[in-house]
Amino acid sequence: MESAPAAPDPAASEPGSSGADAAAGSRETPLNQESARKSEPPAPVRRQSYSSTSRGISVTKKTHTSQIEIIPCKICGDKSSGIHYGVITCEGCKGFFRRSQQSNATYSCPRQKNCLIDRTSRNRCQHCRLQKCLAVGMSRDAVKFGRMSKKQRDSLYAEVQKHRMQQQQRDHQQQPGEAEPLTPTYNISANGLTELHDDLSNYIDGHTPEGSKADSAVSSFYLDIQPSPDQSGLDINGIKPEPICDYTPASGFFPYCSFTNGETSPTVSMAELEHLAQNISKSHLETCQYLREELQQITWQTFLQEEIENYQNKQREVMWQLCAIKITEAIQYVVEFAKRIDGFMELCQNDQIVLLKAGSLEVVFIRMCRAFDSQNNTVYFDGKYASPDVFKSLGCEDFISFVFEFGKSLCSMHLTEDEIALFSAFVLMSADRSWLQEKVKIEKLQQKIQLALQHVLQKNHREDGILTKLICKVSTLRALCGRHTEKLMAFKAIYPDIVRLHFPPLYKELFTSEFEPAMQIDG
């Protein structure tokens, strides 16, 4: 039986720690300085011998240590320091596992036992971090195995080579007259259309696409997010009868939700509204890339003029690929958010995919207001707060201006996390998307979400007309996403191979026209 949540993991780092586990008394932020990592030269790779130590298996020669370190920590993805307790890990995860074994600690998860563990969030949940350590094979018994077998050495050497090649591509400095390298390369087979259409449905189901299992460069774009467990929430059946909210079309409460087939608006209890609002808010907070408080604390960390010029001097295709990667990362969190919304997983798979293809970027733009600083007109991007000038090399200044104008406008509404969550869910569950099979079912779900949003706005004593202002943003969001598609298609017409080979599969699945026929419904 699990005990009460333990105190945060002591942050004292062992010698040689990468610095992701902060010093005692400090707090790790999710905003790592990627530029520091990019400056590290790729390590040479040679075959090496290994010996067992009291703490695990480590490289015998100090000069060979960096060969193992090129493989990231299997627990959190930070820079590794060797093989510890049978697994390649960083110093922080090695120390965490050692302390957990020495103290026989029992941790509890304050959420749903499926927390994402990476270098930015590993200290937030000790239970899930320990479970991941055990899942990848960390064990005190691993130190007893002695020398590695030839098969193990060959496998490790192959992995080192693969990561070295990837790092060389990432860290290679652009030479005069040479184009900055693009990485990774995605191999599209003759039937790639069907396979990539399957990527999104597999991702919704919580499975990593088969193609990405074979290539870690591809899988790096699919976050290690476990399938969402069943939502427990409130026990509606155990709640005493509450006042009934009977909202009808005549009352004007649903001016933004169309009714088809003679359907009437739902009759919803206050308890059900509270439950839905709590479910969506909780799902939102659990699937945000960054904590709002942490983002607000580093708004002063803007790009220097020299750094801005570095972005401006990037090749257009390189900057496009970087933005595609960042958008894809954000969308992965939106997919997980959708999966946790009560009712979404009960929709047919076709409708789940249609809603995500149509609405995921809209939700990304809504969430952007959390990372937008209206005072200096910057948004969090690639480790710091960026002005529109950072994106100049994309070649679409009008679109970037549109994005920043929307971010500033939504930010000026000062939405709470609950309000952002419910508005995001409302936008995502739009019943007017093309190719939906169960429009009425989605309509009813969206209507309930709108009621919950109205309920929260009233509880927060927001001014009259705030809901109308929010709903008016929907048309702006769609125009914004339409502009994104136009710019992408223009770029793709010039650089078709760049998009085909170097853009993340999920991004292409969502936004490029070559995948749209897969969504069509017969009849």
UniProtKB/Swiss-Prot annotation:
Induction note: Induced by oxidative stress and DNA damage. Isoform 4 is induced by hypoxia (through transactivation by HIF1A and SP1), but not isoform 1.
One cellular component (GO) term of this entry: nucleus
Keywords: Activator, Biological rhythms, Developmental protein, Disease variant, DNA-binding, Epilepsy, Intellectual disability, Isopeptide bond, Metal-binding, Methylation, Nucleus, Phosphoprotein, Receptor, Transcription, Transcription regulation, Ubl conjugation, Zinc, Zinc-finger
InterPro entries, A to Z: NHR-like_dom_sf, NR_DBD_ROR, Nucl_hrmn_rcpt_lig-bd, Nuclear_hrmn_rcpt, ROR_rcpt, Znf_hrmn_rcpt, Znf_NHR/GATA
Annotated GO biological process: angiogenesis; cellular response to hypoxia; cellular response to interleukin-1; cellular response to sterol; cellular response to tumor necrosis factor; cerebellar granule cell precursor proliferation; cerebellar Purkinje cell differentiation; cGMP metabolic process
Consequence of changing residue 183 to A: Greatly increased transcriptional activity. Decrease in repression by NR1D1
Effect of residue 183 to D/E: Some increase in transcriptional activity. No change in repression by NR1D1
Tissue: Widely expressed in a number of tissues. Expressed in both regulatory T-cells (Treg) and effector T-cells (Teff). Isoform 4: Highly expressed in the central nervous system, including in the cerebellum.
Comp. bias regions, Polar residues: 48-57
Phenotype for residue 183 to V/I: Some increase in transcriptional activity
Effect recorded for residue 507 to F: About 40% loss of transcriptional activity
Main localization (coarse): nucleus
Top-rank taxon, per record: Eukaryota
Gene3D superfamilies (alphabetical): Erythroid Transcription Factor GATA-1, subunit A, Retinoid X Receptor
PTM field: Phosphorylation by conventional PKCs in neurons inhibits transcriptional activity. Phosphorylated on Thr-183 by MAPK1/ERK1 in vitro. Sumoylated by SENP1 and SENP2. Sumoylation, promoted by PIAS2, PIAS3, PIAS4 but not PIAS1, enhances the transcriptional activity. Desumoylated by SENP1.
Pfam family, one: zf-C4
Motif (AF-2): 506-523
Extent of Low complexity compositional bias: 1-26
Coiled coil: none
Family the UniProt entry places it in: Belongs to the nuclear hormone receptor family. NR1 subfamily.
Function: Nuclear receptor that binds DNA as a monomer to ROR response elements (RORE) containing a single core motif half-site 5'-AGGTCA-3' preceded by a short A-T-rich sequence. Key regulator of embryonic development, cellular differentiation, immunity, circadian rhythm as well as lipid, steroid, xenobiotics and glucose metabolism. Considered to have intrinsic transcriptional activity, have some natural ligands like oxysterols that act as agonists (25-hydroxycholesterol) or inverse agonists (7-oxygenated sterols), enhancing or repressing the transcriptional activity, respectively.
This protein's domain notes: The AF-2 (activation function-2) motif is required for recruiting coregulators containing LXXLL motifs.
Subunit-level organization: Monomer. Interacts (via the DNA-binding domain) with HIF1A; the interaction enhances HIF1A transcription under hypoxia through increasing protein stability. Interacts with CEBPB; the interaction disrupts the interaction CEBPB:EP300. Interacts with the coactivators NCOA2, PPARGC1A (via LXXLL motif), EP300 and MED1. Interacts with the corepressor NCOR1. Interacts with MAGED1 and CTNNB1. Interacts with CRY1 and PER2. Interacts (via AF-2 motif) with PROX1. Interacts with NRIP1. Isoform 4 interacts (via AF-2 motif) with isoform 1 of FOXP3 (via LXXLL motif).
Listed name of the protein: Nuclear receptor ROR-alpha
Origin species: Homo sapiens
Encoding gene (name): RORA
